[in-house]
């Protein structure tokens, strides 16, 4: 009996500090990812906004790592808009800023693979969380950016209340 109490006491005293003094850093990093239906709403709203402005475009959404999450092409838009919209989205996501803000400052990045420094790529941020990027191609570059912003705006009300 005495031996069991002694062993229990030893284990208790040995394990107690582990609970009282946990590591300062969390062992898990939590990331937020756009649900597929939100990514689809963004590209749909971006393409529709450009149609209202009189332009036929493609729109792409990529996740935080630059992987394609959603894509929509107006059937009458040029075939080149497929690749260009993806590259604009990739550029804004991986550099985490609008392509319109990168281009004047970082021409050296024009040689990086899949980076396209043409206006029309916008990062997707809500409530301080980064989700990825959206790129639009087929209109004038300044209009592409406005349509990308319209795509983000279309889901902003939903995303503002995400916990």
Which role does the model predict for each range below?
Residues 9-10, 92:
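General helical structural elements
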Residues 13-21:
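Hydrophobic h-region of N-terminal signal peptides that target proteins for export
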């Amino acid at each position: 009996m005495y031996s069991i109490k002694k062993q229990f006491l030893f284990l208790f005293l040995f394990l107690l500090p582990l609970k009282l003094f946990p590591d300062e850093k969390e062992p898990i990093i939590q990331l937020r990812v756009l649900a597929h239906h939100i990514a689809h709403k963004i590209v749909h709203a971006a393409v529709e906004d450009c149609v209202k402005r009189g332009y036929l475009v493609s729109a792409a959404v990529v996740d935080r790592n630059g992987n394609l999450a959603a894509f929509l092409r107006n059937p009458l838009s040029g075939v080149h808009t497929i690749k260009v919209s993806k590259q604009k989205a990739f550029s804004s996501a991986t550099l985490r800023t609008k392509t319109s803000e990168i281009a004047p400052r970082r021409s050296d990045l024009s040689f990086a693979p899949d980076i396209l420094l043409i206006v029309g790529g916008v990062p997707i941020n809500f409530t301080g969380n980064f989700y990825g990027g959206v790129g639009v191609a087929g209109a004038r570059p300044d209009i592409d950016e406005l349509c990308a912003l319209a795509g983000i705006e279309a889901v902003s009300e939903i995303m503002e209340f995400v916990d």
